[in-house]
Amino acid sequence: METVESSSSAELLRAQTHFSTQLFSFQNYASLKCALHLGIPDAIKQHGKPMNLSELTSALPINPSKAPYIHRLMRMLVKAGYFAQENECFDLTPIGLLLLKDDPINIRALVLLELHPALLMPWIALSEWFQNDDATPFVTAHGKSFWDYTSRDPEFRKLFDEAMAGDSELISKVLVTEFKYVFEGLKSLVDVGGGNGTLARSIAKAFPNLKCTVFDLPEAVANEQGDGNLDFVAGDMFDRVPSADAILLKIILHDWSDENCVKILKNCKKSIPGKDKGGKVIIIEGVVELEKNAGNEYAGLENLDMEMMVLYNSKERTKKEWAKLFSDAGFSDYKFIPALDSWCIIELSP
């Protein structure tokens, strides 16, 4: 094993640079959160063309004494790739377009959720959690589970639902175009944990003869209104799931332990007809091996797996781990359909 003394100066400098990049990367995200709170992406969009610094500063809700500091914030955000700068004017990059508040496909709420103090504090408590018997670092930080916290904080619940809805917009676009065949022949579908119905609305629109039901906790669907072939039903997936030809679980199971996943899947199995009548469960989840095969350069399932541990004491799963869950829940047939990088559509049959 090499030691610091045996390493060359060049190697040590590269190591120091690597650590500096990692340590200071949080500043990019804190600066991005600031930009969203100030409305910088939307200000540029509303302007209709690239904005110079004076125009941008005048459009922002800031104290006049802070105007001289905006150029330093923008320099950081340009380097991070969220904005472009040319001839002293700032514009949105393709990445920045995903930050617009009123665009149906956006990750603005997801960014604000991930940088919310409620989600940052458990990471600070991570080492403490390893030394105690709390279920999760989230419990160590807040004294309650993620779901208890969410149910007691309406504003946080709203942000969480908005973040999930933004994610669903992109997934729904892919589903109803490239994977339309998954829903063909179905007469009824229940979207379990479907929140405000973003995904189910897209499916209902693409398939007018398919009766779609969003099934979620009362606080998630209380203010939602059905329309045409879409309705909302309140309930708990651990108690029962409404009957349908197919049950949809979009990024639900990775939030739960193996034991709870089996409970959810068993309830789904009770609610669909047999394989000979076309009954199935449609799962959208990450599969660890697919990410390795894709060679994705971006932060992926290893990051998400850590977040699942920190928030829920759950995890991302391999094909082998998924297969065991399906078997334990009583499903005899399943197939993995690669969709987006490490994300898969998994079809289960009784």
Curated annotation (Swiss-Prot):
It comes from the Eukaryota. GO terms for molecular function: O-methyltransferase activity; protein dimerization activity. Keywords: Alkaloid metabolism, Cytoplasm, Methyltransferase, S-adenosyl-L-methionine, Transferase. Gene3D superfamilies: Vaccinia Virus protein VP39 (3.40.50.150), Winged helix-like DNA-binding domain superfamily/Winged helix DNA-binding domain (1.10.10.10). It catalyses: 7'-O-demethylcephaeline + S-adenosyl-L-methionine = cephaeline + S-adenosyl-L-homocysteine + H(+); deacetylisoipecoside + S-adenosyl-L-methionine = 6-O-methyldeacetylisoipecoside + S-adenosyl-L-homocysteine + H(+); deacetylisoipecoside + S-adenosyl-L-methionine = 7-O-methyldeacetylisoipecoside + S-adenosyl-L-homocysteine + H(+); norcoclaurine + S-adenosyl-L-methionine = coclaurine + S-adenosyl-L-homocysteine + H(+). Coiled coil: none annotated. Pfam families: Dimerisation, Methyltransf_2. S-adenosyl-L-methionine binds at residues 193, 216, 236-237, 250. This is 7'-O-demethylcephaeline 7'-O-methyltransferase IpeOMT2. The lineage of its organism: Eukaryota, Viridiplantae, Streptophyta, Embryophyta, Tracheophyta.
